[in-house]
Amino acid sequence: ATYKVTLKTPSGDQTIECPDDTYILDAAEEAGLDLPYSCRAGACSSCAGKVEAGTVDQSDQSFLDDSQMDGGFVLTCVAYPTSDCTIATHKEEDLF
């Protein structure tokens, strides 16, 4: 399946198509968006965003704790969409 992922960035909202087997960060880059990242392995917070609607699978991540995930935070470098979703990007500073 392919889902519509709306990314709310500081420079405006962008909606991309993201297959359910593609990490959201990778799909965003393929669409020409410049999102923050560092490790690309789900082990830091550089790429953190916040899910505002919809669902994602970020079971590959190892950095966020349960309360952060329950709060909607997502590491876009290891997150697959599992529905159409809306994610606010550039949220690393909100984690701490």
Swiss-Prot record:
Cofactors named for this entry: [2Fe-2S] cluster
Family as reported in the entry's similarity comment: Belongs to the 2Fe2S plant-type ferredoxin family.
Disulfide bonds: none
Protein's recorded name: Ferredoxin
Domain 2Fe-2S ferredoxin-type: 3-93
Chief location of this protein within or outside the cell: plastid
Binding site residues for [2Fe-2S] cluster: 39, 44, 47, 77
Gene Ontology MF, one: metal ion binding
Job of this protein: Ferredoxins are iron-sulfur proteins that transfer electrons in a wide variety of metabolic reactions.
Annotated cofactor note: Binds 1 [2Fe-2S] cluster.
Example GO BP: electron transport chain
Taxonomic lineage from the root: Eukaryota, Viridiplantae, Chlorophyta, core chlorophytes, Chlorophyceae
Keywords, alphabetical: 2Fe-2S, Chloroplast, Electron transport, Iron, Iron-sulfur, Metal-binding, Plastid, Transport
Subcellular location: Plastid, Chloroplast
Gene3D superfamilies found in the cross-reference section: 3.10.20.30
InterPro entries xrefs: 2Fe-2S_ferredoxin-like_sf (IPR036010), 2Fe-2S_ferredoxin-type (IPR001041), 2Fe2S_fd_BS (IPR006058), Beta-grasp_dom_sf (IPR012675), Fd_pln (IPR010241)
Native source species: Scenedesmus quadricauda (Green alga)
Cellular component annotations (GO), alphabetically ordered: chloroplast
